Amino acid sequence: MELKDYIATIENYPKEGVVFRDISPLMADGNAYNYAATEIVQYARDKEIDMVVGPEARGFIIGCPVAFALGVGFAPVRKPGKLPREVIEATYEKEYGTDTLTMHSDSIKPGQRVLIVDDLLATGGTIAATIELVEKMGGVVVGCAFLIELDELKGREKIGNYVYKVLMHY
């Protein structure tokens, strides 16, 4: 299946000069959505995953079906003020500004093997902050998976030696 057929391209969104890759058509097609999630599940099967972690909001959309298929839990990464209990946080640079991400401080147990799932790898700020959060709790990041990588933004440089899977490159 050619997943790029299910990605809408929007020029100059959310600001002038940005090309936005919209995954909504992929999610709206059950076969394409299932195919994408299954590809990530196949990548993760031999990694002995204990927990899937996904940044808000589209990391939830991709990460939850992956966690379900793997038979493991899902831990959300949220913006400040969105989680009701004690949190840890990490600040990062993104494509158009700076942001902070949080997780409940008990989301990951020391030694748990974690797969991080998100829709997009752009500048790498979100993934770097998510890795930092998981590792602050003693988790072991055993892989990362993305629907899309924007190659020219070089986000892979922030992943370092972490193994990762990408389904589509732009």
Swiss-Prot record:
It comes from the Bacteria. The keyword Cytoplasm applies. It holds the Pfam family Pribosyltran. It catalyses: AMP + diphosphate = 5-phospho-alpha-D-ribose 1-diphosphate + adenine. PROSITE patterns: PUR_PYR_PR_TRANSFER. Keywords: Cytoplasm, Glycosyltransferase, Purine salvage, Transferase. One of its GO terms (cellular component) is cytoplasm. GO terms for molecular function: adenine binding; adenine phosphoribosyltransferase activity; AMP binding. GO terms for biological process: adenine salvage; AMP salvage; purine ribonucleoside salvage. InterPro entries: Ade_phspho_trans, PRibTrfase_dom, PRTase-like, UPRTase/APRTase. It is found in: Cytoplasm. Pathway: Purine metabolism; AMP biosynthesis via salvage pathway; AMP from adenine: step 1/1. Its EC number is 2.4.2.7. SUPFAM superfamilies: PRTase-like. Belongs to the purine/pyrimidine phosphoribosyltransferase family. Homodimer. Catalyzes a salvage reaction resulting in the formation of AMP, that is energically less costly than de novo synthesis. HAMAP family: Aden_phosphoribosyltr (MF_00004). This is Adenine phosphoribosyltransferase. It comes from Lactococcus lactis subsp. cremoris (strain SK11). The gene is apt.
